[in-house]
A protein has these predicted regions:
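Residues that define the transmembrane beta-barrel architecture of outer-membrane proteins
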Residues: 32-34, 44-48, 79-83, 116-122, ...
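Transmembrane beta-strands of outer-membrane beta-barrel pores
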Residues: 40-44, 54-56, 69-73, 89-91, ...
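Outer-membrane beta-barrel transmembrane domain signature
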Residues: 115-204, 220-222
Length: 222
């Protein structure tokens, strides 16, 4: 049974490389409260995403709360997807240098001919950047962790391995550290940004099938 879980978890590892969080220019806060986001990127494949954030203009610690949804390109819609919800807080501002952190709960689903896998996890990241009203750039370090995972094996797989069992399993299946750079340009009530970087598993020894991520995104503020 342990071997079965391990083999199935390898498929899940393709989904852990998910770094499509919204990028914000903290120096261009404005009075807008709503941020709509669309993005496209390459993680474990080509990924399309949409997001919404509500901005809280706290003078000391400005923050956004929101949700995101992404899906990879594929033949069957909603076989694989990821949903995230959480908060992004700017903690420190020294002249034009700013530091922020992001914490999001994550739900992922992945399905192939052997199993349908779903997990709940946590994505945490910190960004140090230089922010101007018209442009910004920074570096990001984060950790994406799968905490508890549900396995539902296909009938075909159960015929081959009749001892396999469906259900929730813990401890955590695994996680990835990711690090990279990001930058963007702001005009009026809109942002265009690019982010890219590398991914490594939590044991610091192995890398995912695609050990890097790239994303292009667009924000519209209302």
């Amino acid at each position: 049974m342990n071997n079965t879980i391990y083999k199935t978890a390898l498929f899940l590892g393709l989904m852990l490389n998910t770094v499509n969080a919204q990028v914000i220019n903290w120096a261009n806060a404005g009075k807008e409260k709503h941020i709509l986001n669309a993005n496209i990127g390459a993680e474990y494949g080509v990924v399309f995403g949409l997001g919404y954030a509500y901005k809280l203009n706290h003078k000391l610690f400005p923050m956004t709360v929101g949700a995101e949804f992404s899906i990879p390109s594929g033949n069957t819609l909603l076989d694989d997807y990821k949903a995230k919800a959480g908060a992004n807080v700017r903690w420190i501002k020294v002249h034009d240098f700013q530091f922020s952190t992001r914490v999001q709960g994550v739900f992922r689903r992945f399905e192939n001919e052997n199993a349908a896998i779903a997990n709940f996890g946590l994505d945490m990241a910190g960004v140090v950047g230089y922010y101007r009203p018209k442009w910004f750039g920074g570096v990001e370090l984060g950790f994406d962790k799968a905490i508890v995972t549900h396995f539902k094996h296909s009938e075909h797989y159960q015929e081959i391995y009749p001892e396999v069992k469906n259900g929730w399993y813990e401890p955590a299946t695994g996680g990835n550290f990711y690090y990279g750079v990001q930058g963007g340009y702001t005009f009026r009530d809109q942002d265009i940004y690019l982010k890219f970087g590398n991914v490594v598993s939590q044991d610091f020894k192995t890398k995912p099938l695609l050990p890097f991520y790239v994303q292009i995104g667009y924000n519209y503020k209302l």
